[in-house]
UniProtKB/Swiss-Prot annotation:
It comes from Escherichia coli O6:K15:H31 (strain 536 / UPEC). The gene is sotB. The chain crosses the membrane at residues 15-35, 50-70, 81-101, 103-123, 136-156, 170-190, 209-229, 246-266, 275-295, 299-319, 333-353, 364-384. Coiled coil: none annotated. GO terms for cellular component: plasma membrane. Keywords: Cell inner membrane, Cell membrane, Membrane, Sugar transport, Transmembrane, Transmembrane helix, Transport. Pfam families: MFS_1. This is Probable sugar efflux transporter.
């Protein structure tokens, strides 16, 4: 069934359902950032030691995105979404019951398996179900779900963790996923696999230098961001010396700014994606370099978080738009690779932040993250001058 055979209202409702699913999946990926201290206290570990959980999760997603996508390339998409949500929910129940850090990590690996499949198919499904001529808006809506995960999901998850324990945060996410699953079952039509690609697509994609350059840019800039972002909660409390409540407010502010970035990209991204992304990377570089100097003032940290959140949302959207434009004939394979590469960056950044915190000083995470951010800025200028791409261009 296509959007031509259903009303625009129903088409948008389906896209909104996917956006809610995106909110759920991104909430569970981001929420440990706000719970590291509580989890560490529960298992009598150092915060930096618990942080390795972020790297494990991200690298499992990176490793399994493409294999899982290929294994499920011929599976009807509605059925696939239902199955991955079942795994997702069961894994969160195990997170709630975790009696050791090892069990918690195992449960997070289960979530990562579901995550690996979900993000390899979501963007293409959103475009497919959107009303005619509304591809960019559909992607922006999915991105809004991502932003709301930081705006509402992460801070609410942290608040629940503060008052009811971190286990209840994961349990609540599982309940939210169950409700979303019921909505998916009711709203989505049968969705045969389309343009999913196969192993035969890989050599073709690898021979596209513009696409490979975007992938390289993605891993470098995401590494820069997560070097600092992964440990922002303990940084605010232990280095800046501010309260746990302020740390929650800062995460809320950073996520809320992401919505501003989503709006900006939704209006200008089709025509000026390259310029927006390079500008956003430059803004990220400045934010990381100023993280420690800004730590002497709540106002300074708050202002920095606003620009940081705007920058990362524009970067994430810009990378996704370019990947879709450069691989219209194998969107699922290309997005599986993108999801995997993005998570390599998350894992690498979390690991770098972990090592800096353990063996140097957590106060240096911003400066260390600024190094790959500078490299990403230079690389973005080079590749965008050589391969300018907009959403409508399907360059190969």
């Amino acid at each position: 069934m296509t959007t031509n055979t259903v009303s625009r209202k129903v088409a948008w409702l389906r896209v909104v359902t996917l956006a809610v699913a995106a909110f759920i999946f991104n909430t569970t990926e981001f929420v440990p950032v706000g719970l590291l201290s509580d989890i560490a206290h529960s298992f009598h570990m150092q915060t930096a030691q618990v942080g390795i959980m972020l790297t494990i999760y991200a690298w499992v997603v990176a490793l399994m995105s493409l294999p899982f996508m290929l294994m499920t390339s011929q599976v009807e998409r509605r059925k696939l979404l239902i199955c991955l949500f079942v795994v997702f929910i069961a894994s969160h129940v195990l997170s709630f019951l975790s009696w050791s850090f090892t069990v918690l990590v195992i449960s997070r690996i289960g979530v990562a398996f579901a995550h690996a499949i979900f993000w390899s198919i979501t963007a293409s499904l959103a475009i497919r179900m959107a009303p005619a001529g509304k591809r960019a808006q559909a992607l922006s809506l999915i991105a809004t779900g991502t932003a709301l995960a930081m705006v509402l999901g992460l801070p609410l998850g942290r608040i629940v963790g503060q008052y009811f324990g971190w286990r209840m945060t994961f349990f609540a996410i599982g309940i939210g996923a169950l409700i979303t699953l019921l909505c998916l079952i009711k709203l989505l039509p049968l969705l045969p696999s389309e343009h999913s690609g196969s192993l035969k697509s890989l050599p073709l994609l690898f021979r596209r230098p513009a696409l490979m350059s975007i992938y390289l840019l993605t891993v470098v800039v995401v590494t820069a961001h997560y070097t600092a972002y992964s440990y922002i909660e303990p940084f605010v409390q232990n280095i800046a010396g501010f309260s746990a409540n302020f740390a929650t407010a800062l995460l809320l502010l950073l996520g809320g700014a992401g919505i501003i970035g989503s709006v900006i990209f939704g209006k200008l991204g089709n025509q000026y994606a390259s310029a927006l992304v390079s500008t956003a990377i430059a803004l990220l570089l400045v934010c990381l370099a100023l993280l420690l100097p800004a730590a002497n003032s709540e106002i300074h940290l708050g202002m920095l978080s606003i620009f940081w959140g705007i920058a990362m949302m524009i970067i994430g959207l810009g990378m996704q738009v370019k990947v879709l434009a450069l691989a219209p004939d194998a969107t699922d394979v290309a997005m599986a690779l993108f999801s995997g590469i993005f998570n390599i960056g998350i894992g690498a950044g979390a690991l770098v932040g972990n090592q800096v915190s353990l063996h140097w000083s957590m106060s240096m995470i911003g400066y260390v993250g600024a190094v790959p951010a500078f490299a990403a800025l230079i690389w973005s200028i080079i590749i965008f001058r050589r391969w300018p791409v907009t959403l409508e261009e399907q360059t190969q």
